[in-house]
UniProtKB/Swiss-Prot annotation:
Record keywords: Coiled coil, Membrane, Mitochondrion, Transmembrane, Transmembrane helix
Region of interest (Disordered), residue spans: 1-20, 153-230
Organism ancestry: Eukaryota, Fungi, Dikarya, Ascomycota, Pezizomycotina
Keyword set includes Membrane: yes
Natural source organism: Fusarium vanettenii (strain ATCC MYA-4622 / CBS 123669 / FGSC 9596 / NRRL 45880 / 77-13-4) (Fusarium solani subsp. pisi)
Bilayer-crossing regions: 40-59, 71-93
PROSITE patterns xrefs: HIG1
Function: Cytochrome c oxidase subunit which plays a role in assembly of respiratory supercomplexes.
Pfam families in UniProt: HIG_1_N
HIG1 domain ranges (all copies): 12-103
Subunit structure: Associates with the respiratory chain complex III/complex IV supercomplex.
Coiled-coil stretches noted in the UniProt entry, renumbered to this chain: 93-156
Biased composition (Pro residues): 1-12
This protein's encoding gene: RCF1
Protein name (record): Respiratory supercomplex factor 1, mitochondrial
Length: 230
């Protein structure tokens, strides 16, 4: 019906849900519990056994009347035991159904606990894998950054070397000439050529004017000093 209360999912709560002793019951504890719940059954079993023993003793003595009485008592005690069992089964039928239901619930709880443990274990492994992947990604990014920095530094060094090749070569020649490893014959040949050119210019002057020898020597000295500076 639409106006009725909403249905509760799952089984109804039981009064035995909080009874952990009932769940974790040992076999001997179960036997004693059954004896306490149905005391007439063990009583009928005891009476049947006693009647059988007395009938056996009467037969050993040769007392047939006593033996017959004990056999009748055994049959009566056995019938009493059967009636007690039937009455107990009828009386404790609901409790047995509840115990069966509780066993099923316990099995379901155990299965659910196993499933939850399995899920937690999978989640823990997933977290470990994610953390490992994050560490690997971080290391990869660091390596890429280092490689990029090294490439930038190499490119900058190559650019500086391309911009100043002449300065580096001139500096090397100046250092070699200072320490005496640069060849000095080239300088002497250049000085001779300059002197010869000056002599030819002074000799072949068409104006016929004579230059002052001191001035020509001064010019020659300035040229030689400029060559040395270069």
């Amino acid at each position: 019906m639409a106006d009725g209360p909403p249905s509760i999912p799952g089984p109804l709560p039981s009064s035995f849900d909080s009874d952990q002793d009932f769940y974790n019951e040992r076999p001997m504890q179960k036997v004693f519990r059954k004896i306490k719940e149905e005391p007439l059954i063990p009583l009928g079993i005891g009476l049947t056994s006693l009647a059988f023993v007395n009938a056996y003793r009467a037969l050993r003595r040769g007392d047939s009347k006593q033996a017959n009485r004990m056999f009748r008592a055994r049959v009566a005690a056995q019938g009493f035991t059967v009636i007690a069992m039937l009455a107990g089964s009828m009386y404790y039928q609901k409790d047995r159904e509840k115990s069966k239901e509780l066993r099923q619930l316990q099995e379901q709880r155990d299965a659910e606990e196993k499933r939850l443990k399995w899920i937690r274990e999978l989640e823990a492994r997933d977290d470990e894998e994610k953390a490992m992947k994050a560490r690997l990604e971080q290391r990869r990014q660091l390596v890429q950054a280092q490689r990029a920095e090294e490439a930038e530094a190499a490119a900058a060094a190559a650019a500086t070397t391309e911009e100043k090749p002449e300065a580096t070569s001139g500096g090397a020649g100046g250092i070699l000439s200072r320490i005496g490893l640069w060849p000095q014959g080239e300088k002497k040949e250049e000085e001779k050529k300059v002197a010869e050119e000056l002599v030819e210019e002074t000799a072949g002057d068409k104006s016929g004017k004579k230059k002052n020898p001191k001035s020509s020597l001064g010019d020659l000295g300035e040229i030689i000093s400029s060559q040395k500076k270069d």
